Amino acid sequence: MKRDDLIFDIIEKEHQRQLKGIELIASENFVSDQVMEAMGSCLTNKYAEGYPGKRYYGGCEVVDQSEQIAIDRLKEIFGAEWANVQPHSGAQANAAVFLAVLNPGDKFMGLNLAHGGHLSHGSLVNTSGIIYTPCEYNLKQETGRVDYDQMEEVALREKPKMIIGGGSAYSREWDYKRMREIADKVGAILMIDMAHPAGLIAAGLLDNPVKYAHIVTSTTHKTLRGPRGGVIMMGKDFPNPWGKKTPKGEIKMMSQLLDSAVFPGIQGGPLEHVIAAKAVAFGECLQPEYKEYQKQVQKNAAVLAQALIDRGFTIVSGGTDNHSMLVDLRSKYPTLTGKVAEKALVSADITVNKNMVPFDSRSAFQTSGIRLGTPAITTRGAKEDLMLEIAEMIETVLSNVENEEVIAQVRARVNKTMEKYPIFAY
């Protein structure tokens, strides 16, 4: 068979882009060779509808083993009693929880998307906001942190069936204990989407929501540094509170509802090659060097945030507890949009994404902010000294967004600097 040079040339172009640039998108990371190897394995050939030991296809004895290892390792990392590793993505994991917990039209509550929430937590263009009825809580304008008092007020008034914690652009620790107290007051299920800080939580550097929430979802990429995918967990299984029964008349456990919501609810056959790669990544999470990596992610984020503050940038909430930060450009560059800032930085081979900031006056297509994160650059071996350089280069570019010569100089500096850093240093 003739090799598809067209596609493989494109893949090599992307490889070179990743090698030469500084990756600061908070949701991106670089996987190890063994994770990549598992993803590209012959397991991609196997159909395996169902779950280990209960499949709808024959010949699943081998993939049963790799999927069970993924489940067991994930449970060990987070202290969970039950886990499902089949969701194809974090959004799919969230959609499965919605299907298990809510009926169409039911009310739920999540963080305002414009304040750092995620589109799968109630955006009106996402299934979560189309099929179900969202209400929202916000950040405090003066602190840039979650307003738990307002969350409680909204919960008591709206009586949501489910409350969601977690977001895509929130740099601070969450008060899971308070959220559980609020959920219990109104009889709601508490779901925590820990997709962004999951790796830091796995390393014990941030509080573990599995101890507090009824249900926890996550992606397996981002800080967790695995393949692209999703998972669902529970600290403790429990009988479903709505009295749903098995054909034998027994009350179904919540794990049964969640398993059924993933398959056959929203997915068919699982991606067993990706699940094997998840298992490999979870094995890496259990190694001592993984905690050292996550400590460096956290250190690098704190140093980068402070270096930007020292240069006159505004960081929402004044800093970061995790791997990420949201830069409000308005104070330093009043006329500069996130869209223009992103384009200029990408031209200098510094990859970021535009992002709305709390109480933004601009649209989601323009924005007044950019989001930055340190997981990927830390995987390449970066330490605090490089963060100081990066802050300097960001300021140089954003002060010269229309000066192609300056941007070219920064790009050359970025490319030269990154020659010293492998894609995967751990």
UniProtKB/Swiss-Prot annotation:
It is found in: Cytoplasm. Pathway: One-carbon metabolism; tetrahydrofolate interconversion; Amino-acid biosynthesis; glycine biosynthesis; glycine from L-serine: step 1/1. (6S)-5,6,7,8-tetrahydrofolate binds at L113, G117, H118, L119, S363, A364, F365. One of its GO terms (molecular function) is glycine hydroxymethyltransferase activity. It is an enzyme of class 2 (transferase). Coiled coil: none annotated. One of its GO terms (biological process) is tetrahydrofolate interconversion. Keywords: Amino-acid biosynthesis, Cytoplasm, One-carbon metabolism, Pyridoxal phosphate, Transferase. Belongs to the SHMT family. This is Serine hydroxymethyltransferase.
